[in-house]
């Protein structure tokens, strides 16, 4: 009897979700320029993620971060886990392997080439570093990632005092043109279904539990690249 009542409550919640969705606009947590799968790639490299956000980019990080000098990128140490850039690079490399297979340059090769690049934080930007890396590796496209929030949850999968929160932007650059042909931003702090019924789809897609920051990051990558 109790189980039947729980199912009824769940069905009502889902029904209300669709009703409310028709009356309100869902807050965007994923912003992406469509067409990633349509970009023809012969040889692609994933540049190691960069950590940071420029103050002037807070309102529009998608369009400005790529051209911000490295020295002007900053982040709150409490907002970004220490090795967030390394974790994100690994997660995205794994996801891109499924999409690009033989066209994706192995991570050790990219890491070695990136380490050899001369770097000048006062003048270098993520865009300029990506183009230099692409030329060095003879890649026609380079994926660039910038992470500016990576907060771990406080609690467990069943109960969390503070949820995980992850935010990052991705760009796919055409090396010859030096410009992005695709870009996307993921910015999400997990919410309970009881807090926002409009998030029901994401709530169930995430397993109806509180995710770790790593799990939320993987979820975000899947959302933006359409895996």
Q: Where are each of the predicted segments found?
A:
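Bacterial N-terminal signal peptides
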Residues: 10-21
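C-terminal/domain-edge helix-coil "capping" segments
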Residues: 23-58, 133-137, 149, 160-227
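N-terminal segment of the mature soluble domain
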Residues: 53-146, 175, 179-183, 214-227
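Short helix-to-loop capping/linker segments positioned immediately adjacent to catalytic or ligand/cofactor-binding
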Residues: 131, 154-158
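A generic structural signal for short, solvent-exposed coil/turn residues
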Residues: 15-17, 36-38, 96
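Short low-complexity, flexible loop/linker segments enriched in glycine and/or proline
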Residues: 120-121, 158-161
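Short, solvent-exposed loop/turn segments at secondary-structure junctions
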Residues: 113-114, 150-155
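Bacterial N-terminal signal peptides that target proteins for export
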Residues: 1-11
């Amino acid at each position: 009897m109790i189980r039947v009542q729980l199912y009824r409550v769940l069905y009502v919640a889902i029904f209300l979700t669709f009703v409310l969705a028709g009356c309100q606009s869902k807050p965007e947590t994923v912003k992406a320029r469509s067409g990633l799968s349509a970009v023809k790639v012969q040889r692609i490299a994933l540049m190691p993620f960069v950590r940071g956000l420029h103050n002037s980019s807070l309102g529009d990080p998608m369009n400005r971060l790529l051209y911000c000098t490295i020295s002007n990128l900053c982040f709150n140490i409490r907002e970004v886990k220490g090795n967030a850039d390394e974790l994100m690079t690994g997660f995205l490399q794994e996801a891109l392997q499924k999409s690009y297979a033989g066209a994706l340059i192995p991570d050790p090769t990219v890491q070695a080439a990136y380490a050899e690049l001369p770097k000048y934080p006062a003048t270098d930007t993520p865009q300029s570093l990506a183009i230099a890396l692409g030329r060095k590796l003879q890649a026609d496209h380079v994926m660039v990632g910038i992470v500016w929030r990576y907060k771990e949850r406080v609690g467990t999968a069943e109960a969390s005092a503070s949820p995980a929160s992850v935010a990052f932007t991705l760009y796919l650059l055409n090396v010859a043109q030096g410009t992005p042909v695709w870009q996307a931003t993921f910015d999400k702090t997990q919410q309970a279904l009881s807090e926002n019924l409009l998030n029901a789809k994401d709530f169930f897609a995430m397993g109806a539990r509180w995710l770790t920051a790593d799990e939320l990051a993987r979820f975000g990558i899947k959302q933006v690249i359409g895996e």
